[in-house]
Each structure stands twice: as C-alpha cells, then as structure tokens.
Regions:
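A residue-level signal for conserved active-site and pocket-lining positions in enzyme catalytic cores
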Residues: 28, 97, 208
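Glycine-rich N-terminal segment of FAD-binding domains in flavoprotein oxidoreductases
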Residues: 46
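Short glycine- and acidic-rich boundary segments immediately preceding or forming the N-terminal edge
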Residues: 1-33
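Active-site beta-strand termini and strand-to-loop segments that position acidic
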Residues: 34-38, 201
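Active-site-adjacent mobile loop/cap segments within catalytic or ligand-binding domains
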Residues: 164, 190-235
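Conserved beta-strand scaffold positions in the cores of enzyme catalytic domains, especially
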Residues: 19, 33, 75, 152, ...
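Active-site/substrate-binding loop(s) of hydrolase catalytic cores
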Residues: 39-43, 52-186
Length: 235
C-alpha cells in the first residue's frame, strides 16, 4: 500500500476531517468516531474513564498528524465525553462505563477505584441499574457489532502495561514498541469490563495502559506509537 504522509507540524492544531456520530451521551453530547477509508481491522478508543484525559490527548495528537483517513483503523477520542468534560471517572450518572458491559460476571451495585495511584481503592461508583444501562455503553456495543473490527485497543492510565488476555502477536509487538510490561491481566477482578465483554465474544481486546508521567512525557512516549498504529496495518 502507499504510505500515508504526515501533515507538517504547523497544521497539527486542527483536524483535517470531521468525525461522524455513533450515538449520544447521557448529557446529549455526540459520541464521535473517525472511520477508516477501508475495512475496519482495528478500533482504538480513549477516554472511557474521564479521569484519564491523557489518553484522549495522545490519540488526538496522533490523529491530527494524518493527511488522510487511516486505511484500517477507526478512532474514538472520548468514549465517555460527559466524564471527560466533568473530570470524573464515571459518566454523568455516576456509572463506571468500564463496569457496565453485559458480561457473565456483571453485578448490580458499586465498584471502587483509587483517587490517586497511591491511595486505597475506596471511591465509589455505580455499575449501572442493569448491564448496558448507559447510552455510551449501548452505543459502543452497537458500533462494534456494525464495524466488526478484528481487534480493539482500549487506552487507559496509569498502570504502565500492555494487558492482553490472549497474548496476541499485536499485543506483544505493542509491548516491545512501548517498552511496557506485557501482562495477561491487571491483577484484580474487573467484572462488567469492556475487555471481558470482548473476550466473551471472541473479540481480541488489548488494554494499552500509559504510565504515570507528565503530559509532555506521555505525548513523547505514546503519540509516535499511535501514529504507527493508525498508518501501518502491519504494525
């Protein structure tokens, strides 16, 4: 295939093309996707936890460098825009979207998370009134059923690892490229998570966890990798 040329840095302040909508959030904000020019082989999404904005920043910077659509990769910059604009891990209804997917282990109730990586996991959020109770969750499920990507990369922070339950070649290459540990799980149970939902459906899901670092360090470390993922189907 012909290599995708990158825009000059002076043009990185804006998007060359506009996204389409695949739904709306609880607050009515469009859920946006940049679709590939060809068959969707890979979906990369960021910002399902609004308190992890560095994932959105990095993926946005990578996407803004392209002169044309990715040939193979769909991009979602903010799977939880309500949480992103409010600075909360959950959505506007206080639901952790990454515990709201209809998995065999989903349970109603609350789930905890850490306020900072150094604190105990004691901050409460809801898992939702029922599995897939949230519009953001349902929209992402419907989108994936339509796109039928061969794999999904979910961007998170700050656990500093490549989490791939399938130990796939793509996950292994990503770990080598980023110098992040390659693990089969993050060390604790995640009922109702997107990764579990994908696994139950035979959809390979790789969780790309950024390390705890300054924003500029994050951009330095991860934007070039994301550009490669967007432009090179053989990554």
């Amino acid at each position: 295939m012909t290599a995708i040329h990158l825009r000059p840095r002076t043009d990185w302040g804006t998007f060359l093309r506009q996204p389409t909508s695949y739904g709306t959030s609880h607050l009515g904000i469009p859920l946006e996707i940049w679709r590939p020019s060809g068959t969707c082989e890979l979906l990369i999404f960021a910002g399902i936890h609004g308190e992890e904005p560095e994932t959105t920043y990095a993926l946005s910077r990578a996407l803004r460098q392209l002169t044309e659509p990715s040939p193979h990769c769909a991009v979602i910059l903010a799977a939880n825009p309500d949480g992103l604009i409010r600075g909360t891990r959950g959505n506007a209804r206080g639901v952790d979207l990454n515990r709201n997917f209809p998995t065999r282990d989903w349970r109603p109730g609350t789930v905890t998370h850490r306020s900072t990586i150094h604190d105990p996991s004691d901050v409460l959020l809801s898992t939702g009134g029922h599995a897939a109770s949230e519009p953001e969750t349902r929209a992402l499920i419907s989108l994936i059923e339509t796109l039928a990507p061969k794999a999904v990369i979910a961007l998170h922070a700050p656990l500093a690892c490549i989490d791939d339950a399938n130990a796939s070649p793509l996950g292994e290459r990503l770990a080598k490229r980023t110098n992040l540990p390659f693990v089969r799980d993050v060390g604790y149970h995640t009922p109702g998570s997107f990764g579990t939902w994908g696994g139950e459906r035979g959809l390979p899901v790789i969780t790309y966890e950024f390390a705890l670092a300054s924003t500029e360090q994050q951009m330095h470390d991860h934007v070039p990798v994301l550009v490669e993922l967007l432009t090179n189907p053989a990554f």
